[in-house]
Structures are given as structure tokens and as C-alpha cells.
Amino acid sequence: VMIAVGGLTRLTDSGLSITEWELFTGILPPLNNEAWEKYFSLYKEIPQYQLINNDMNIEEFKIIFYWEYFHRILGRLIGIFFLFPLIYFHFIGKINNKHISTCYLILLLIIFQGIVGWYMVKSGLVNNITVSHYRLSLHLSIAFLIISMIFWMILNIQNNTFKKFLKYKKDNFFFNFLVFVIFVQIILGAF
């Protein structure tokens, strides 16, 4: 869901509509006209508005704002819904020791993903009308890495095995190569 929301945020050119990274205070959207005017005036200061969207009104701005807002809220929720169960199940001993380091690595990647997301947005706030494609591809790569690691761990748990993530075997060369090519093709979509 998050990758789809991120993709739609990009396709609707909504990613630069929120020009500040308010990690804790940005949880609520603007609730009155004054707050909307504040966010809209901040958007008016960036090149995307000045060069492309200078005829945009506040109602049109609200549409792109909500795409980016939902993307950020969903990211926060994913982080929270991963963090608290992880701590709880680790504390009561329900996570197999073989998987605990992978779980915490996924948590760190989720946090890093948020930081990279803001780093990506910053690239589009000055001198550009879009974000850096390199930063976008990094953001997308981390998303696919997180999803792949979670999927891999689910398969390990279902099959009661512990196989290392991205373990290379000569007899799996074609499969590994195919996965690599698909991954590269997806990342090239950022360009």
C-alpha cells in the first residue's frame, strides 16, 4: 500500500506540497483557513509553484497537500505499528532469536526511509521543480528492501527455517540474476 501511495504522490506531483518536516507537530492537517494559508504560502516560495503551478488556487493546493500528507501519515503509522509490537513481542520472548536482528534491522530501515524521504523532498525545494532522481531511486530502493526483507522473514517463519536474506548459490544463479534485473528495472523507473 505504501509503495502505491508513494507512487501516486509522485505521479500527482504532490510530494513537494509540504515544505517542512514536522515529524511530531505535522500529525494534524491544517484545521482552519489561516493554517491552510500558511502552508499554501510556504508552497508558493518553492520553484515548483513559481515555475509550473503559479495559477494554482488553494482548493487545488489542498488536493496535492492531502496526497503528501497521507503519504507521511502512513509512513508514521507503519513505523509505530512496527515499533511497538516489536518491542512488546521481544520483551515477552515471542520472537525467535534467529529473527530478532532482522526485525531490528527492518525497524532501522523504516526510520532511515523516513529520513531519506525528507532528504529527497529537500532536493526539490530549491532550484528544482522536482526531486532528485537519485534520491528518489534511493527512497524506492529502501522501500523494496524493507518489503523484501519482511516477505523473506515471513517465508522463513512459515517454513520454520532460517535462510539468510540474499544468500548467493551457484545453482540459483538464473533466479538471482532475474531478481536483480527486476529490481534494477524498478529503480530505473525513478529516472
What residue ranges belong to the model's regions?
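Long, glycine/tryptophan/cysteine-rich extracytoplasmic
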Residues: T25-P47
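Individual transmembrane alpha-helix segments
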Residues: L42-I80
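Interfacial segments of alpha-helical transmembrane regions
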Residues: V1, K98-L107, K164-V184
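N-terminal signal-anchor transmembrane alpha helix
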Residues: V1-G26, V181-F191
